[in-house]
Amino acid sequence: MKRKRIAGVCIALAAVVLAGTFAVSGNNTKDKNHVEIINVSYDPTREFYEEYNKIFADYWKEEIGQSVDVIQSHGGSGKQALEISNGLPADVATLALEYDIDAIQNAGLIDNGWINEYPDDSAPYTSTIVFLVRKGNPKNIHDWDDLTKDGVGVITPNPKTSGGARWNYMAAWAYANEKYNGNETEMKAFIKKLYKNVLVLDSGARGATTSFVENGQGDVLIAWENEAFLSVRDNPDDYEIVTPGISILAQPSVAVVDENVKKHDNADVAKAYLKYLYSDEAQELIAENYYRPVNQTILKKHADTFDLNVKLTTIKDFGGWDEVQKKHFADGGVFDEIYEE
């Protein structure tokens, strides 16, 4: 399986360039008329935050009288967490899972208890994992079993660098857990067979979408639900979505990077930026961008968009992210075991 390409060779160089840009931008001086914040996020949130930044800027201008500019950075969630820990001057981190926020906390940049700063464990939107297939579903892909069949090319990112990829993997693991009644020998064999069909491990979810949609690789993309919807919206004649029989409740997490906002003197706007994600206006925008709002009233308004009956497991069913990371994605973990053989 080592023959497969693992994408992302240029990530480190790109990060150096970004860090240089942010080093100039991140030195906020107090200005009663203008403020700037840096949002370091994961791959498929680009379109949402481009729109959200506009409505937040309008809100902040009306409430405080300050104009606000938001600089965005996007990439694989695990990689982004590492870059922040290594000096990328994010004011807020909006990443794919709580483990990546914890990694920044462990680097001394985020205060303890961040998960309780905002409602719903500081997860203002959720998602799940689905399959994006080519129009007409020529390989008859309906559930996780079909991804292990001979001749099926699978595209999914690398769980070493991508938070979405870890959700993908754990959704497959949840299916295997149910199918094999918790027999880990059989579960590992199933996951190994699935990853044997993976053609390329891109560094992030957007790179995986590019491989599937723009480069025409593979028969099925394991994807964030919102990313799959965007692909169908933009290419309705080319793709369709398949919801597997079991998936996982994916909970992206948000946090203020406390040490950085102290340096930049912009804690008030950074905290408000995350708090406003829970407003009705932002929750509607979240749904329009195919994330699942945590406001249940607004979620139900969009029931025609989302499959609200899909069986969703949670990461807590597997002991939480600390245990999952250690068991599956740390060096020498289950993923290394099944992928490197």
Regions found by a protein language model. Name each.
Residues 105-178:
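A conserved helix-loop-strand patch within extracytoplasmic ligand-binding domains
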Residues 7-8, 21-107, 117-118, 224:
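Early extracytoplasmic/lumenal segment of secretory-pathway proteins
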Residues 180-244:
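Ligand-binding pocket segment of bilobal, Venus flytrap-like solute-binding proteins
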